[in-house]
């Protein structure tokens, strides 16, 4: 039997109707995606499946070494907001870009797919960030990210009116690498809760969790109603060896958790129990970039339209299945046609 949703994941009765179903906050990046053999990772000392932060010089070196690549606006939370819009939902995004060519491309791309972009104040000295994604033959993605101005987001950059006008606030763990961003997350969560809204967080990456474990745990306990993470991220968050241990630990700290486990599907965890939902079948996996982002999009779209938790997870699986069937972190078809 599907566990009930905790009261903590239900909007306050006093909350006014939301203009947006989901409002995301994250690193506003342009993705540079290329296929390469495992030998490329070895040659450039890249850890398969990881997300490494790099400086300008390293970014230029890897970009030149890749050769042919696909470039598009990206960033984890931005991908999720685009997924929500593709499903027919109303989404807004808060992120920091510069007044440069890539920044203009980023904003135009979001508006083109129906996501309201609420940029922070630009910084003339720092360019728009970009993420270099190497996809190996096994469809694993290895990310090297030059954060640029995206990482400078602070509480002053928040559009608090948009946050208060969103049913669910969605915060991207990748942004957690600076104290100003952590403070912005806490402020955003406070604004959302004061308006009777729900707060969600995606852990983003196990290495990111390792860097900020204590801060993540505190944020989850104090401010998060809905938590997203994959198996590795959950194990890292609680420093345990098995998924069962991680599920029992997170159950005590967060009222609603969605844990993705690749081909094994996903687990929906509440204080009342755990339900496993099978993954959507995919004929051929070409690129896992954006799988977790689109799963969150489907899940939150379902949650904000009143679906059961099992159906929320199924919507997440449908969205993730579409995005891993091709190169790139955004859907190539309107997801609303698949549900």
For each predicted feature, which ranges?
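Hydrophobic beta-strand scaffold residues
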Residues: 91, 117, 199-200, 257
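Conserved phosphate-binding/catalytic region of the ribokinase-like
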Residues: 2-23, 28-29, 42-48, 65, ...
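A short, aliphatic-rich alpha-helical micro-motif
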Residues: 17, 160-164, 220-221, 251
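Glycine-rich phosphate/adenosyl-contacting loop at the front of the ribokinase-like
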Residues: 1-94, 104-105
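Conserved phosphate-binding/catalytic loop of the ribokinase/pfkB sugar-kinase fold
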Residues: 118-122, 133-179
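A glycine-rich helix N-cap at a beta->alpha junction
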Residues: 109-126
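Conserved beta-alpha-beta core of the PfkB/ribokinase-like small-molecule kinase fold
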Residues: 168-248, 264-266
